[in-house]
């Protein structure tokens, strides 16, 4: 049994309607703009309890009965011709919006350490330790509940206007501006004169806001996203017990996979690359970052035990390592990545993402480079999976994995011995050599699911894997412990469903997740592992037969992979063919 982030809520609508007035604010335009003042006016000026906005034509606002405001008075205070206001009962509000109204009202109960800010129709939690030393950047946690009742907590950044070079850019001017009050809470800037010291909900390019899902250290365990999600549920039940009850939902675990199956992939990768000539080229401006490149070259040469060349010696067999900037750098420039030849193994290393990491964790970066080169070599030259023994599954016939990207369908057909071939269809009249792929292609068109992958097993069963908003939550008791442990017993009790690979059953529906590796795990879990849903299209559920294809680390170094590893091959094939 494990806890998930899906909320189970029950509402006392009669009590809610006796205590609160709820209004729906609607625009005659296509949508309410993200920076519209109407998203803050009810909170700032007319004492609304909370306001919820979900990117569309309507926002919802709640008031206490004692601060009664009429529909016409609310309309007058908003002072916008395109807006209309309608008073509604709580039973007319969708559950995910209603629970948000209560969650966002927690902005009225902030403490010294945690500030809850209901601004722009959203809820942001801030903490003194999340503010940069110079005060120009403030990390925050955006709390929301999706339409499927899954609670989410995502890191974001509020940045001082003074940081941005182009302060008059259209993108910046369209964002609402907020002032930081003396008590640490945000409030909407009322006029443009105030905005020189204001913040906007926008990060600095290349700097992603990060707050860990769960910290397993005594002094920081109450700083992760999971802690605040659990705290919100506790606060809701404590403060609003007359109006609702809320809890995280349970899900049954049917099977766990804890052992990895690719213990020798590092050696296999090294063996593959060392059997080829390797050359390092730069796509930088002439002479730029030459010291970084030479350092990279030296590290790679030492790991391989052979010289790294400056150019190809045998073009038909050599492997290329390309040194360049990352994608963000080339946003407004000519990107050399898009011009790389894909008729040979070419692995890119970026200055921003890799060179610094080589100093910090040389082994991990170099092993990642070599395993990526090996996968590309499997695709371009070997036509066989070499980093795992596919034949050990003892399948009798072919397995097929398919995915769609930008209207194009791609398929990987794997034979029982681990050899494979790819096919793709472009356009409505595109043809396949393998006739089975026509049916799979049609199935992909029919299913409206997120991030879907289609699978045909060796018995003719067809399944689809799709991404959900679900993830597992830690046992709330973990936040009360005086001493933390990461041993097997503690992982089972407090981190059920979060660590290792788990197969779930939820009232007949099948899900799985590939969590963090439990054995030897670190003290922090950066991200929550999403649950993937397995939908049977024809025949039986097949995911258990290939659950171990997620227990490999050659897809994402030192981590289990969230999709069967043939999808990694398929994605690399897509990149190669799209570039060509």
Model-assigned labels for residue ranges:
Residues 1-239, 243-252, 257-261, 280-580:
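Long, contiguous domain-sized segments
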Residues 263-272, 310-311:
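Membrane-penetrating hydrophobic segments
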Residues 275-278:
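Non-transmembrane, membrane-adjacent beta-strand/coil modules in membrane-associated proteins
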């Amino acid at each position: 049994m494990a806890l998930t982030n899906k909320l189970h809520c029950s509402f006392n609508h009669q009590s809610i309607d006796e205590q609160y007035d709820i209004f729906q604010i609607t625009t005659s335009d296509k949508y309410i703009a993200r920076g519209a003042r109407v998203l803050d006016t009810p909170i700032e000026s007319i004492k609304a309890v909370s306001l919820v906005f979900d990117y569309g034509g309507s926002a919802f606002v709640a008031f206490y009965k004692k601060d009664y405001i009429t529909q016409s008075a609310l309309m007058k205070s908003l002072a916008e011709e395109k807006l209309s206001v309608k008073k509604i009962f709580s039973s007319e509000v969708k559950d995910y919006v209603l629970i948000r109204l209560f969650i966002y009202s927690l902005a009225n109960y902030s403490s010294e350490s945690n500030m809850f800010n209901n601004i722009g129709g959203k809820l942001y939690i801030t903490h003194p330790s999340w503010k940069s030393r110079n005060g120009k950047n403030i990390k925050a946690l955006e709390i929301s509940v999706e339409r499927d009742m899954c609670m989410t907590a995502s890191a974001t950044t509020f940045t001082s206007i003074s940081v941005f070079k182009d302060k008059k850019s259209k993108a910046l001017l369209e964002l609402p501006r907020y002032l930081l009050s003396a008590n640490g809470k945000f409030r909407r800037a009322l006029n443009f004169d105030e905005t020189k010291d204001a913040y906007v909900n926008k990060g600095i390019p290349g700097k992603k806001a990060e707050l860990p899902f769960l910290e397993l250290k005594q002094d920081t365990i109450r700083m992760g996203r999971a802690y605040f999600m659990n705290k919100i549920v506790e606060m809701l039940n404590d403060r609003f017990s007359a109006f609702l009850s809320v809890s995280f939902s349970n899900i049954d675990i049917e099977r766990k996979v804890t052992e990895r199956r690719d213990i020798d992939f590092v050696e296999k990768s090294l063996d593959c690359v060392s059997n080829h000539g390797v050359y390092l080229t730069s796509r930088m401006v002439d002479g730029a970052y030459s010291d970084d490149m030479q350092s990279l070259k030296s590290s790679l040469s030492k790991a391989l035990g052979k010289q790294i060349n400056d150019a190809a010696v045998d073009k038909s067999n050599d492997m290329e390592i390309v040194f360049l900037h990352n994608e963000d750098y080339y946003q407004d420039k000519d990107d050399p990545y898009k011009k790389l030849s894909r008729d040979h193994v070419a692995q890119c290393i970026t200055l921003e993402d890799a060179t610094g990491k080589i100093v910090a964790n040389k082994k991990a970066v170099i092993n990642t480079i070599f395993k990526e080169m090996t996968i590309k070599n499997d695709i371009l030259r070997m036509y066989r999976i070499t980093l795992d023994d596919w034949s050990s599954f003892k399948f009798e016939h072919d397995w097929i994995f398919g995915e769609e990207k930008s209207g194009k369908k791609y398929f990987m057909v794997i034979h029982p011995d681990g050899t494979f071939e790819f096919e793709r269809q472009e356009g409505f009249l595109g043809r396949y050599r393998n006739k089975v792929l026509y049916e799979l292609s049609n199935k992909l068109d029919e299913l409206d699911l997120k991030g879907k992958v289609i699978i045909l097993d060796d018995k003719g069963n067809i399944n689809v894997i799709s991404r959900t908003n679900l993830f597992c939550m830690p046992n709330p008791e973990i936040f009360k412990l005086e001493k933390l442990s990461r041993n097997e017993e503690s992982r089972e009790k407090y981190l059920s469903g979060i660590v290792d690979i788990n197969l779930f059953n939820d009232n007949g529906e099948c899900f799985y997740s590939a969590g963090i590796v439990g054995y030897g795990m670190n003290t922090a879990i950066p991200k929550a592992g999403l649950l993937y849903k397995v939908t049977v299209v024809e025949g039986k559920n097949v995911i258990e037969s290939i659950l171990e294809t997620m227990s490999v680390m050659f897809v994402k170094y030192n981590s289990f992979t969230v999709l069967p590893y043939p999808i990694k091959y398929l994605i690399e094939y897509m990149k190669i063919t799209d570039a060509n």
